[in-house]
Each structure stands twice: as C-alpha cells, then as structure tokens.
Amino acid sequence: MKSKDFLAAFGAFLCIFIMATVSDLDANNIWIIPPFGASLVLAMALPSSPLARPKNIVLGHLIAASAGVIAYQILGNNPLSIGIALGLAIYLMLITDTTHPPAGANPILAVLGGESFDFILMPVA
C-alpha cells in the first residue's frame, strides 16, 4: 500500500468520524448524510479531479439540495418531483461549473424526506 493511499483513507475516516461524532452529540440536528461519504471518496482519493474541487463539493451540494427542497415544496413527494429535482440539480450544476456527482443524491433525499429549506443549511451547508 502506498502512503498516499493510506493518507486518503485515513483522511476520509477522520472527516466522517468527526461529522458523525458531532451529529451524535447534537441530537437536535443532523450533521451527516450519505452523500458526504461519496464526496470524501472524491476529495481524498481523487483530489486532482475537477469534480473534487472545494467549489464543486460545497456549491454542488447546496445547489442540488436547493433543487430538491424547491421541487418538494412546489410538487410534494411523487415520482415527477423526484425527476424534476434531479434534472434541475444536474442542469444548475452544469451551468455553474459546480458538478459534483455525490450531490446528485441530495435532491432525492430532500423530496423523499419532505425536507424544508432548513435542509439546505443543516446538514448540507
């Protein structure tokens, strides 16, 4: 095993461990969602990928979560709103050059979870 591989794995472990610990300590808020694990794979294992740029990670998650919440607020929880939310998220990430594939799960989570605008700030931001 190369030392950079170990550092990537350890960095991902440390980041997700801290987020999970904070989430465990703060029973009133969720600090971790599954797409963050996929983001850490990109950020730690493929840091030179354009999809792993900090701008893409942060804005991709915010944009995608916003698309999901807006779709849910307007259309409710149904197959059409899930499709619109994901399509809108992808479109907005592409035109803003903030594409981040793990963020594609956020609009689905937002619609299925019936999330309010708070979801955009906690846990996404």
Q: Where do the protein language model's features map onto the residues?
A:
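Internal alpha-helical transmembrane segments of multi-pass membrane proteins
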Residues: 76-100
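C-terminal binding/interaction regions
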Residues: 104-125
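Active-site beta-strand/loop microenvironment that shapes enzyme catalytic pockets
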Residues: 66-67, 94-95, 106-108
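Membrane-helix interface "capping/anchor" motifs
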Residues: 48-56, 93-103
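Alpha-helical transmembrane segments and their membrane-interface boundaries
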Residues: 1-70, 74-83, 116-123
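Hydrophobic transmembrane alpha-helices of multi-pass, membrane-embedded glycosylation machinery
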Residues: 39-40, 87, 106-110
